[in-house]
């Protein structure tokens, strides 16, 4: 059993039997407490069973005798991150990359955490480390571009996101963010081309349809914009932004106040506190009231 425990464990975990995996590894470690691979696997199973504190103790046991064990460092880092101990998580990820600088997964995990913490400069070093190992890593290009977008370095973001799409043309997140970047740069026609290209592969993505509607609205094509917003709502009628976008086109460009009011009301049914919908409805109602004929006009014509 001990010699084949890895295959047995894989079968148990594949079938969702975490308790079986726990019992298997517990038995192996009772027979051989020095089996480092089994102990690391045990920590991962403890984590999956919702016992992060004991999982952390398990990884610490490994690291006490093997302080450079990359799998244990990664496991501890993920647990620290889960528990909100971000500094220790970063420290463990960093040690893991020092001991195995070619481990792309660790660089990626550390970069994502640093981005989450808005430490964009340090995260960028992670993406660069990955790209030195594999210049065609689409996810690294995407993450790098996403961070550049967040700090409003739109030229850099555009370049990175285009590279992400070059190496993975199916990555809709890269398409959506590239569209946003191009719109920020005022390149609406280019954004529309990207959107149309992405929709060929992701025709059921409501975000792409909504983005297309916003681009068409900016290009002063309200009828086409309305069509795009309706397509987005057919796919997902619960996105507040789309209802507000639709209402804005109906009101500002097509002059259909009643239909616009209905769209804003739909948005507020979903989220009564969505301020864009609240403000739009208030302003629209004020306009409707202002355009009502006075009582004298109604009496005397």
Feature roles, as predicted:
Residues 10, 44, 78, 112, ...:
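Residue-level recognition of tetratricopeptide repeat
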Residues 14, 48-49, 82-83, 116-117, ...:
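Register position in tetratricopeptide repeats
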Residues 2, 36-37, 70-71, 104-105, ...:
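Helix-start (N-cap) detector for alpha-helical repeat units in TPR-like alpha-solenoids
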Residues 1-4, 261, 269-301:
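Terminal, low-structured helical/coil segments at or just beyond the last alpha-helical repeat
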């Amino acid at each position: 059993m001990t010699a084949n425990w890895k295959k047995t464990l894989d079968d148990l975990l594949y079938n969702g039997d975490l308790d079986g995996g726990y019992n298997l590894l517990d038995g192996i470690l009772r027979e051989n407490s020095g089996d480092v691979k089994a102990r690391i696997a045990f920590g991962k199973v403890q984590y999956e069973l919702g016992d992060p504190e004991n999982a952390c103790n398990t990884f610490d046991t490994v690291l006490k005798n093997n302080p450079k064990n990359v799998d244990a460092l990664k496991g501890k880092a993920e647990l620290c991150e889960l528990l909100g101990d971000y500094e220790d998580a970063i420290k463990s990820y960093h040690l893991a990359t020092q001991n195995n600088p070619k481990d792309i997964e660790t660089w990626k995990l550390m970069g994502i955490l640093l981005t989450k913490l808005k430490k964009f400069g340090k995260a960028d070093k992670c993406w660069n480390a990955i790209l030195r190992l594999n210049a065609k890593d689409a996810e690294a290009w995407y993450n790098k571009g996403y961070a550049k977008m967040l700090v409003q370095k739109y030229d850099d973001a555009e370049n990175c996101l285009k590279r992400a799409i070059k190496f993975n043309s199916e990555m809709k997140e890269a398409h959506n963010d590239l569209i946003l970047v191009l719109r920020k740069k005022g390149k609406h026609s280019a954004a529309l081309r990207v959107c149309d290209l992405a929709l060929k592969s992701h025709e059921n993505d409501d975000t792409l349809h909504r983005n297309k509607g916003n681009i068409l609205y900016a290009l002063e094509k309200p009828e086409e914009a309305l069509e795009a917003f309706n397509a987005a709502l057919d796919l997902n009628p619960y996105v507040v932004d789309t209802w507000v976008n639709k209402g804005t086109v109906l009101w500002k460009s097509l002059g259909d106040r009643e239909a616009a009011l209905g769209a804003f009301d739909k948005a507020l049914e979903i989220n009564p506190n969505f301020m864009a919908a609240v403000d739009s409805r208030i302003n629209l109602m004020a306009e409707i009231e202002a355009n009502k004929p006075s009582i004298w006009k109604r009496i005397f014509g």
